[in-house]
Amino acid sequence: MRIVSLLPAGTEIVAALGALEELVGVSHECDYPTAVQSLPRVTSCAVDPHASSIAIDREVRRIAESGAPVFALDAAQLARLAPTLILTQTLCDVCAVSEGDVRELGAVLDPAPRILPLTGTTLDGVSRDIVIVGEAIGRSAAATALVHEIAARLRRVHETLKAARAPRPRVAVIEWLDPLFAAGHWTPELVRRAGGVDVLAEPGAHSAEVDVGRIRDARPTLLLFAPCGFDLARSARESAALLETPAWEWAAGIEAWAIDGNALTSRPGPRLADAVETLAGIIAPSILPAPSAAYARRIA
């Protein structure tokens, strides 16, 4: 099989199922595991990822309003790679290449590849995606084992918290810094599984723009900053700077952490289990292991 993955989560699922050698192409954002970094890239982004949060947001909105795609597919490269399976997504047209663009291009390839969209917006949905990918690439047993492993890890966190009768802090998770967005989809469930209460969103709901007043009025006792696509260093640097602004004076004294959103919360794949364990270590540090310094850093 010749697999092209157009999203990091798909790439991570394929790798976790032991089919890394069948990947022949990936998106420009696929960086884990490190072995995929040498594979041909079949997508590009029209927005400078190193620009400021507000500049990125404005450019994405401008492009979307113009009707142009934020992400482009390299048709010639895709044709050269001759994939038999393309993994895509239906979740967000400003997060990855749209399913419609993929199907349009796939229809002119000869032979036509199977196009498989990943649709999960909750942990259960992500588990279903893993099973579906496993079936598509002939790795059903590995997929079932991976889903069971993820469930077992989440269960261990739950049982530890339950046995300790740990209090449930009020948690606000910020997915974008300017404008502010509350994290949605699977993130509220990550918080709940890690022992907290998400005060800004419900599991499965879309990420939504919020103002700082709403965050303040939600009375969080823990602030988590996990900007979509930012690594830990950038997340920590820009989130700490945000907390120093006058609009956030009310948050003085509230514990705050920066999270590697690029690795943990932006990708609906196997590492969501790592995300739960990381958040649990922040939420209940006296009960569960401290989070890895590679994934989280306290900023206040």
Descriptions of predicted regions:
Residues M1-A300:
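N-terminal ligand-binding lobe of clamshell/alpha-beta domains
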